[in-house]
Amino acid sequence: MEMNPLLVCATVAIVFATTTIIRILFSSSSLPQMKWPSGPRKLPIIGNLHQLGDDVLHVALAKLAKVHGSVMTIWIGSWRPVIVISDIEKAWEVLVNKSADYGARDMPEITKIASASWHTISTSDAGSFWQNVRKGLQSGAMGPLNVAAQNQYQERDMKRLIKAMSDEAANNNGIVKPLDHIKKNTVRLLTRLIFGQAFDDNKFIESMHYEIEDIIRISGYARLAEAFYYAKYLPSHKKAEREAFLVKCRVEELVRPLLSSKPPTNSYLYFLLSQNFEEEVIIFCIFELYLLGVDSTSSTTTWALAYLIREQGAQEKLYQDIRMTLGDVDLVKIEDVNKLKYLQGVVKETMRMKPIAPLAIPHKTAKETTLMGTKVAKGTRIMVNLYALHHNQNIWPDPYKFMPERFLEGETGTAYNKAMEQSFLPFSAGMRICAGMDLGKLQFAFALANLVNAFKWSCVEEGKLPDMGEELSFVLLMKTPLEARIAGRNV
């Protein structure tokens, strides 16, 4: 006997609605018992999702904060309340002054698959494991002496990158897609920090680049399950879980053979092996560096290039800053990057306009604490909107305008005041500030200086400016990857 398809669909819908209502009734009693900050009115089942509109999440939340206050409760679906902070004073209370209280993590369930069940720096709570691994990374592989030892290799890689872009432009009517070139350069740097300077395997680099792309694609499915509890049982989410598991297996297959090597003592692998961690933990602590380091540097660099294409005056100022400071050089050396004042302004302004992680990595209270004197229960989810802090018009004049001069002192710039300094948090702040912050800033500045020194950047078509639309994944990506026309500088 055949069943009526409409009857089947109706039955499924009724079951879904019934179980969702049951979930709402029972989950409300399990929420942290506290007085939640006010926020926009929520609807059954969907919570505040209907008020997030067509904007990317950080922009939508910034708009809601202007109406409902700088500390508000947002319901992601009907079962996940999140306190969203869009004010610098409250942000500092959470991130800095009470960083231990707010130092736990709130990660999507699907991320357990490729993080050794949340045993990595970014996904684990702020306990002894987290402290040990973070310290080992920062004092060893990312220590100042080890990073400085990479300079000659990075400068060699940059020459290769410039040559590769020149070749691409020559074969494509002057047009290039810079993102992949920058990504692969970053993979090479991280590979040397992880496995040692002698490691140079192009096949490994290509394979790791592919796995990073794949896990970022899959991560988008996590949002549906975060909003609707039973969405994790849908075929699309189950498919995402299977694909994430396949990435996990491929990453293990890629990295596992390297664990039996004898890495140099200043490498990240040497430190991880010395701690007698389980193999899975070692592999995914390594994968984490690629996952968070590659796209953050490459995406921020392409954002900067897009702004400089749109603002040709700023691009010319940067080029003249290089020429006036360093002369007619073929390559800007890493040791010279900090001499370039306008470059530093462009770097900071890009990170202000397009923070790498505009909502940081979500926090959760590790114990009962307070916010502005009001009780906040253990297990409460907290989100700090760094984008909102960076676009507060009371602190940043013309906040939506790209102005590197705002970070400069003197005749051509505005005074960089204390309020701006406290509100500029592209890498978050406090004990959970990005572990690779210093390296990330240096690589961004080094890449940008050399790309502007080597090429003049312009629109692919006259008058057709780069699309500045955003896509939020692990980091803030360009919705439409940058394409540009380049011409070699006559130096």
Swiss-Prot record:
The gene is CYP719A1. One of its GO terms (molecular function) is heme binding. It comes from Coptis japonica. Involved in the last but one step of the biosynthesis of berberine, an antimicrobial benzylisoquinoline alkaloid. Converts (S)-tetrahydrocolumbamine (THC) to (S)-tetrahydroberberine (THB) also called (S)-canadine. Its cofactor is heme. SUPFAM superfamilies: Cytochrome P450. This is (S)-canadine synthase. It is found in: Endoplasmic reticulum membrane; Microsome membrane. Expressed at low levels in roots.
